[in-house]
């Protein structure tokens, strides 16, 4: 799973990042690849109830990449974080396949409630730099969320969300 996912990530990066030169440079130089690789290991350990070890790996990865992904989060295939510094992905977040996000994105909760408290993000979603998607909300497939938007409500599939708070518009 991990290595097939890296291959899919590399292909997604090549398609969407004009600065990507070749597979080797992507694997060695893109913090997103490193963060997601170690997230997969931490998530595996978390599922084995080795919570301390999972969180330790998560925190060490955050130190080296600037990307914080809780090992309890669920992330699909082909996930890409472009310029990942400052990304935070909460414990009960679910991210489906082929999602792209930029630096400074938070997929977080709104308080200290228990249970499902973070967003569920559909497939083929793009989340702009600095966006905050907060609470146990549903983001549909093929959604684009604008930079610095604050999303506090569900977004149906095939929409665009922009602003503070985000206004949902039809995709063109």
Locate each region found by the language model.
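Terminal amphipathic alpha-helical/low-complexity segments used for targeting or macromolecular assembly
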Residues: 1-65
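Left-handed beta-helix
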Residues: 65, 70-71, 76-77, 82-91, ...
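Catalytic-pocket segment enriched in acidic/His residues
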Residues: 114
